[in-house]
Amino acid sequence: MLTTATVRGAGTDLYYERRGDGPPLLLVVGGGGDHGYYDGLAGDLADAFTVLTYDRRGNSSSVLHGRPAPLVMAEQSADALAVLDASGLESALVFGNSGGASIALDLAARHPGRVRAAVVHEPPVPAVLPDPGPYLAIYDEIDRLLATEGWAAAFTHFQAAVGGVPPEAIAVSLDPGPHLPPGPLRDLLVRVSRNWEYMTRYEIRSFIDYRPDLAAITANGTPVALARGAGTTDPALTQMSRVTAARLGAECVVFPGGHTAPLEIPGAFASVLRDLLDRLRPSGRG
């Protein structure tokens, strides 16, 4: 059974969904996404987990109170805890993809008592790289375009330079409605297209500048596994996952698909995630 609700956070109302039965599992989405990004994944996992998905502040149905401001990671973690609190949960398993993976790392570092285990899929954390300069140069150009040509030009460069997305597909992502037949995928893509400006102005740079406290995670002993996509085309993302895993002394598990596999192939992705969560989950914590 699917239930929906809203919880008040600090300066925001957070929309969230709950489905399934079993150990609680919080799915954290990355930049521009919303709860619908995980609909397929959550549905495939709901037979074994109580799955929570939500819209992060400023995205889709999670409205801000006051002026928008650059993303603050501690605030993102507090929002995730607000969803757990509203659901009556002391702790949960956590999965995050992309920017949501960075939030999962922050939760494990900052709030270890609330995280039973975390699976971290391709976090964009260039701070862990031995030479992050070439990767950061892409984001310096995004900043320049944002200041001189506007958010759409900056977003277009981001999609092309980081995701390798062709120009015609970027144009569709900015205005997907006329190009897609009615249905859940169209509804999702129309919703998230309205998040692109907020992501470009307030989230991208903050995610890239985030420095995960890997020493804190090592010290507190939260079970963490990194994940990378077998089909991921950006070698820097793969390297970030591998380096983060090595510094944590954690596994780096190969998942099917690429960076957006949780949306594109949820069934195959869920199968690997389910097995990994079962291995990571501390015994006796259900």
Regions flagged by a language model, labelled:
Residues 90-130:
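Conserved hydrolase catalytic core segment
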Residues 246-286:
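Catalytic active-site module of serine/aspartate enzymes centered on a nucleophile-bearing elbow/loop
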Residues 52, 56-93:
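Active-site loop/oxyanion-hole signature of alpha/beta-hydrolase fold enzymes
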Residues 55-59, 124, 256-258:
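Short beta-to-alpha linker loops that shape the active-site pocket of alpha/beta-hydrolase fold enzymes
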Residues 27-31, 98, 229:
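Glycine-rich His-Gly loop
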Residues 77, 81, 155, 266-274:
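Short, amphipathic alpha-helical "lid/cap" segments that border enzyme active or binding sites
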Residues 5-64, 69:
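Conserved HGGG/HGGXW glycine-rich cap/lid loop of the alpha/beta-hydrolase fold
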Residues 134, 138-141, 145-243, 247-251:
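Alpha/beta-hydrolase
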